[in-house]
């Protein structure tokens, strides 16, 4: 019903929009937009301070205007390390009759190494049909669900100027500092005690999970009342390895590049100089100049961990400099980084892109260390990566309503639920019109819904489903557990619980330096982090900026006591 009409609409819109390129021109790309460059002295500001601001006309697909107030602010934040100054942009959407003490911060899946793919640019009204960077744009269509509740929506560019895809700690810092920035920005009138909820799906789960993990140490003053994430990439190395040779295998190289870029001042151009072949370097250039769908099409089904792209055909796991970084960005690995606020996680058992059991393992480890988690497994063969997100939206909104109302969340314990059936779209939660919206979005994405979904069946038949190593549908049962009791009866849950019980209660020490065998590639590892240094091409922070950072307490927190609040700091 929707496919034909929507396809026709898109074709007509595309043809109609072509003349607009000449007639009206583009809104500048981020790499050409002065707004994205911080003023002199920005390193000496506090986390969450506003460096620049502007009011914008928000839009979807570049041409569909949103009838609400929207601002963008450039704010001070941190890179992968809390003492490394950085900056990024967030986009704030304020509906009519907004509840300004209800803020939903959403990490849109960017999944790329190119600043042009940032969510902030995807929100701009360009006057031209924009479909190249479709990853954040299709999710933005769903923000209406949160705006209709009267909630303020905050959407930070969580990959930062490095476009550091899959660098969880960096994204976590940037999410938390975006919440601080909203409370400091006068035109928004967000109260200091505003309630915040963080959410992210798929590529957006990485910064969300780490924001939740870092909250108590990095931004304890924020009144966060809950977290939500699904289709979660909690173990970056495992996920990248499992994607290799699959349709979205471009994410293997993009993810590895992103993590290294986040720590460039420590490991330099490690992948480029030590790992990639000449063909691999060509692929790297493509990643640094493409959004996710362009890269996926270009390298559809490629095997990056092969002699064609990596020296000697080695796997990512064979490079200690890289595994050190992925270990640091694996959720649940360090007990001291356990979320303390209510957390809803959901995942399809047969997710064809991000393996269920690594997300489940993280939920178990978090629970064992005192988290308050509800982990929902959807075991139906009909639910895959995208459909699981869309059909869960009504229940996500209900969860957020409950969190803003401070309702009990499993008495502080953990709840592991198994749902064997597809979620029924409850129109009593959102209404019939939103059901139609989700069905339309599904049609745009080309995802089939229904019994014997050909997508998941083909993935299983071809052996390319990342869960082929273990799908434990027959042993999964809903259960309530306390710390130390595990989560469910899957092998991964048992393994995580056994490990928890056998270890001492002493905290694991977080590695603070790269292994001594690491070889930095060139003297430009120390170069200044100037105006998005080769902006949009993945070059990241330089260590010279870290010397300008403020000292931090053991909790890594900074409450910006010395900074002016509720105004824009000017350093022109």
Swiss-Prot record:
- Is Cell membrane among this UniProt entry's keywords? no
Compositional bias (Basic and acidic residues)? 491-511
> Which GO terms fall under molecular function for this chain's record?
triacylglycerol lipase activity
* Gene designation per UniProt: LIP6
Catalytic residues as annotated in Swiss-Prot or TrEMBL: 202 (nucleophile), 351, 385
Comp. bias (Low complexity): 512-525, 541-562
Record the organism.
Malassezia globosa (strain ATCC MYA-4612 / CBS 7966) (Dandruff-associated fungus)
Q: Which UniProt keywords apply?
A: Cell wall, Disulfide bond, Glycoprotein, Hydrolase, Lipid degradation, Lipid metabolism, Secreted, Signal, Virulence
Q: Where is the signal peptide?
A: 1-23
Annotated protein name in UniProt: Secreted triacylglycerol lipase LIP6
Q: Which InterPro entries match?
A: AB_hydrolase_fold, Lipase_secreted
SUPFAM superfamilies (alphabetical): alpha/beta-Hydrolases
Job description of the protein: Secreted lipase involved in Dandruff and seborrheic dermatitis (D/SD) probably via lipase-mediated breakdown of sebaceous lipids and release of irritating free fatty acids. Shows only minimal activity against triolein. Mostly converts monoolein to di- and triolein, while free fatty acids are only produced in low amounts.
| Glycosylation positions in this chain | 360, 525
Q: Transmembrane residues, as ranges?
A: none
Q: Which Pfam families match?
A: LIP
A single Gene Ontology CC term:
extracellular region
**Homology family:** Belongs to the AB hydrolase superfamily. Lipase family. Class Lip subfamily.
Name the cystine pairs: 117-291
> Which residues lie in Basic residues bias regions?
528-540, 563-572
Task: Give compartment(s).
Answer: Secreted; Secreted, Cell wall
Superkingdom of the source species: Eukaryota
GO terms for biological process, alphabetical? lipid catabolic process
Q: What is its EC number?
A: 3.1.1.-, 3.1.1.3
Positions of the UniProt region annotated as Disordered: 468-572
Name the major location: secreted
Question: Does the keyword Metal-binding belong to this entry?
Answer: no
């Amino acid at each position: 019903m929707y496919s034909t009409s929507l396809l026709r609409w898109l074709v007509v819109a595309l043809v109609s929009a072509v003349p607009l390129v000449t007639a009206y021109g583009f809104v500048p790309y981020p790499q050409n937009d002065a707004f994205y460059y911080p003023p002199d002295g920005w390193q000496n500001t506090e986390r969450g301070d506003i460096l620049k601001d502007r009011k914008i006309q928000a839009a979807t697909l570049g041409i569909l205007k949103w009838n609400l107030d929207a601002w963008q602010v450039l704010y001070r934040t941190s890179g992968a390390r809390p003492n490394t100054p950085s900056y990024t942009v967030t986009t704030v959407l304020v509906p009519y009759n907004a509840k300004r003490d209800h803020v939903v911060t959403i990490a849109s899946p960017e999944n790329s190494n190119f600043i042009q793919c940032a969510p902030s640019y995807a929100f701009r009204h360009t006057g031209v049909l924009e479909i190249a960077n479709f990853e954040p744009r299709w999710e933005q269509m769903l923000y209406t669900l949160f705006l209709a509740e009267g909630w303020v929506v905050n959407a930070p560019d969580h990959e930062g100027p490095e476009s550091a895809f899959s660098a969880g700690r960096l994204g976590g810092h940037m999410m938390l500092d975006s919440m601080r920035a909203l409370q400091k920005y006068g035109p928004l009138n967000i109260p200091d005690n505003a309630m915040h909820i963080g959410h992210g799906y798929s590529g957006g789960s990485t910064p969300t999970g780490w924001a939740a993990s870092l909250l108590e140490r990095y931004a304890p003053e924020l009144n966060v009342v809950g977290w939500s994430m699904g289709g979660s990439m909690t173990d970056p190395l495992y996920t990248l390895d499992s994607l290799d040779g699959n349709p979205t295998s471009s994410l293997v190289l993009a993810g590895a590049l992103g993590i290294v870029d986040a720590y460039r001042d420590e490991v330099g151009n490690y992948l480029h100089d030590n790992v990639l072949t000449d063909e691999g370097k060509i692929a790297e250039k493509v990643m640094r100049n493409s959004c996710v769908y362009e890269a996926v099409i270009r390298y559809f089904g490629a095997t990056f961990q092969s002699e064609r792209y990596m020296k000697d055909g080695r796997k990512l796991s064979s490079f200690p400099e890289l595994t050190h970084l992925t270990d640091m960005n694996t959720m649940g690995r360090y007990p001291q980084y356990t979320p303390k606020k209510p957390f809803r996680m959901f995942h399809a058992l047969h997710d064809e892109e991000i393996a269920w059991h690594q997300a489940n393992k993280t939920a178990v480890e978090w629970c064992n260390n005192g988290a308050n988690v509800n982990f929902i497994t959807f075991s139906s063969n009909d639910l895959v990566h995208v459909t699981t997100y869309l059909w869960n939206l009504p229940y996500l909104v209900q969860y957020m309503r409950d969190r803003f109302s401070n309702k009990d969340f499993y008495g502080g314990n953990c709840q592991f639920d198994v749902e064997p059936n597809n979620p029924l779209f409850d129109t009593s939660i959102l209404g019939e019109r939103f059901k139609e919206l989700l069905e339309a979005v599904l049609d745009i994405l080309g995802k089939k819904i229904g019994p014997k979904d050909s997508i998941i069946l083909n993935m299983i038949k071809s052996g390319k489903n990342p869960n082929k190593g273990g799908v434990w549908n027959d042993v999964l049962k809903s259960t309530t557990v306390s710390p130390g009791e595990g989560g469910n009866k899957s092998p991964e849950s048992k393994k995580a619980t056994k490990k928890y019980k056998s270890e001492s209660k002493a905290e694991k020490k977080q590695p603070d330096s790269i292994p001594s065998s690491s070889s930095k590639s060139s003297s430009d590892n120390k170069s200044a982090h100037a105006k998005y240094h080769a902006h949009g091409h993945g070059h990241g922070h330089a260590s010279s900026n870290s010397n300008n950072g403020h000292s931090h307490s053991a909790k890594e927190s900074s409450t910006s006591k010395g900074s002016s609040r509720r105004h824009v700091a000017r350093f022109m």
